[in-house]
Amino acid sequence: MAKKNYSKAKSAAARAARRNPKAIIIAAIAVILILAIAFCILYFGFPRTWENIMSSLRGDGTDVVDASLQLPTGGIAFEEGDLSVHMLDVGQGDCILILFPDGKEMLIDCANYNNTAAVRERAFAYLDMYVKDGQLDYVMLTHCDSDHVYFLDEVIDKYQVDNIFMPNVLAEPTSDRWKAEVNALNEELLSMFTDKDTVDTACYAEFFCAALTEPNCNITLNVDPDEDTNAIVIEGEDYTLTFYCPTQEYYDDSNLNSAEKKNAVSPIGILEYNGFRTVLTGDSNEINEPMFVERIGGKLDCDVLKVGHHGSETSSTEEFLDAIDCEYAFISCNAKGNKFNHPRQTTIDRFIERDMAIYRTDNNGDIVFVFNTRITVYVQNRVTQDVNRVGLPSLASA
């Protein structure tokens, strides 16, 4: 009976088609046009959604989109629930902007090694694109090196900063001008800085004075009371950013008499959101990375690594990388314009061995990781992984 009814329906459809063949052609064209319009809207208007669909069809997995998208010139149109981590291309230096899903912002370091005016202007233009209300909720200086601190005094002057996190290091500038500026600061605030080591550079003094005179701003030192306590924990709408800072005991026992020891006071941050973890490092290295690994209990599965110290071979140690087990590495560096030979091929090889996708500001320009139900990567310049896998030799073999 069913077969008989099917045959009748088929015959009826055939007769209808013979009577009005144009209707079928018009309907087919309409369907094709609708599909074409839908494709254009999705592909050009919502590139991230398109890439997510294609990733699922390719079987790339349900959690991570391992393909970079072109960073829009006017900035990313974020979707509800997005958390984004921006690495600005400042050449040899560091500048990380975090935009939290509840509307708060955090800036970690902001500088270029040569204090270049063009780089400074570009960095502020980028910040202005996303920080539209003239206010930054959090600013952190990881350590006192010039390529992390140079622009921060201007950041504090330009924006109302509510919270500043900084090293337990007193500014003792050699120039008479900045010496007088520091001496004029509030004695109660100066008494917070308990470490015997000091920094005498003018750029640190500029930041130091700007930070301690910022109105209505909370100053917190990057110091943990002990290894079981995190002094800096930022919590919000479904996100947590926990910093593992040097302990008071570490500051008391250490002498910051070398570049490596100064770098090692950089806090290591773990940003958690929607099941994803991002590792933030400053210029962390082989001194403080093992301390972090011990404090997390030896293993903490993460996703994205902000590479420490611009890809130096004394950072991103084997033990550290094995402990965090990331899929992505992003590096702030300028391979063609620095005397330090960063990033080192030795370091790059460690990422390659772990099958990590590598992004670099010297090749990719600005880099943005967006976290929601997936990870999406935006870059200013798209290059192949083969390009990003070429580092520089160590200075001894250069």
Language-model region placement:
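Non-globular, low-confidence helical/coil segments that flank catalytic cores
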Residues: 2-24, 31-398
